[in-house]
Every structure is written in C-alpha cells, then in structure tokens.
Amino acid sequence: MKYCKNCLIPSTKPHITFNDEGVCSACLSYLNRPNIDWKKREDLFLKIVDQVKKDKKKNNWDCVVPVSGGKDSTYQALKLRELGLNPLCVTSTTCDLSELGKKNIENLKQQGFDYIEFTSNPKVRKKLNRIGLEMIGDISWPEHISINTIPINVAVKFGINLI
C-alpha cells in the first residue's frame, strides 16, 4: 500500500492517484488552486445559469442539488435560488446523519425547496456495508455510491440537465 508523501492518504482510497513523486491527486489539485482563474470560472458558471434559464422547459426544476445536510449543499441550494433557478434538492440517506444535518434539511424544506429523499432497505444496506468493508475496505462504500448516483438518476428521470 502507498501513502501520499504530503497528507498520508492511502492508495486504497477509491479514485486516488499518485504522481511520480508520491503526491496524491487531491494534494496536487489543492496545490493548483492559485493557478485557477476564479473570475473566468464565475463567468462560465453564470453563462451556464443564463442558458438554463433560457432553456426552461415545462419542467418545474432547473437543476438538481445533492443535499447532505451540511453547510455546503445548503449554501449551493440557496445560491442557486438567489441566481433565479429552482433547484430540486435530493438526498440519499446515510445511516449516520447528524442532528444538525437533519435540522439543515428541515430548514431547506421550510424555505420552500422541493426535496426528495431516498432511503435504502436496511437489510440490503447492511449486506452492502459488509461487502464494501470486505472488498474495498470502506464500510461506507454503498453510501458513497448512492450519494453520487441517486442525484444523477433523479436528474435523468425528471429531464433536468444541470446537477
């Protein structure tokens, strides 16, 4: 097993890569931040938002926001609404959502966001957790998969082009 020379992340982390010097892709991405033209990225984002507004279909929602209950996804939903979009908030329930996370999700609902929550069968989740632990070394692997796939499935099902 390899470990990153900077942060010690192990090579068992899914999708992690290492350069020839033994530095992981996450650290390389972080180190590249000063080279990002943030104004250009903001302009590109606003152009996407404008295009979504122009292409508005009969669909009620303009975009899907994967919501975890944390501050980042809450901010994203609020910011998108501020920019004039109507997001559909989607959660793939985890078995360890904190009380604060639950409160943040309730807060979004109280503010009028449409919200869909997917919860897996507890018996199936238990089996998948075991498989994740034994085969990948990550008991939360099934949650990672659902967090990344459920919002995409919802977007496809409802014909929403922006996630």
Question: Language-model segments: what does each one mean?
Answer:
Residues 3-163:
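ATP-dependent adenylation/nucleotidyltransferase module used to activate substrates
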